[in-house]
Amino acid sequence: MNITAGKYNGRKVIAPDENITRPTLSKVRMALFNTLQSLIDFEGASFLDMFAGSGIMGLEAISRGFEKVVAIEKNPKIFKVLENNYKSLGERQTLIKGDSLKSMPQEFFDVIYIEPPNYAGVYEEALSVIGECKIIILEHTTEIDLTGFELIKQKKYGDKYLTFLHK
C-alpha cells in the first residue's frame, strides 16, 4: 500500500493481516481526499481516524497538509503496525490503543473518519459518541441511520459508499 499524494506520495505503508483489516483502496482514498479538499482547507486542520488499522488514512491526511492526526486502534497487533507506519515516516501524532467508542478524545476535529473493521455494524454507536467537528466521513457498504446529521455528499465506489456528513 502506498500514500497517494502530498509530501509522502509513493511512500509504502505496511498493511496488517487482511483477514482482520480491510485497508481503504487507493482509488477510494484519492476520491475521499479530492472531495474533502473541495470542502475544507487542509492546512492546520485536524483529522480523527476512529478505527485506524494500518493508519493509512491519517498518514494520507498528514501527507496532504493536515497538521494534527489522532488515530485510535483497539487490536494490539494492528496497533503495533500502526505505530511502526507512523515511525517510518518520522511522524509524531497521537496514537491511542483502545476502543474508539470508549476512547474518544473530547476535542474538536475538522474531520472524523469512521470505517470500523469488517463493517462491524457500529456506525450508529460511533456517530453517537463523536464530539464537535466540521465533517464526518463514513466508508460503508450498508444503510446507516443518519438521523440528526446533514448529508453533504455521498459517492459510491463498487460496493462501498463514502458519505460526507455535518453534525
Where do the protein language model's features map onto the residues?
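Class I S-adenosyl-L-methionine-dependent methyltransferase catalytic core
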Residues: 1-167
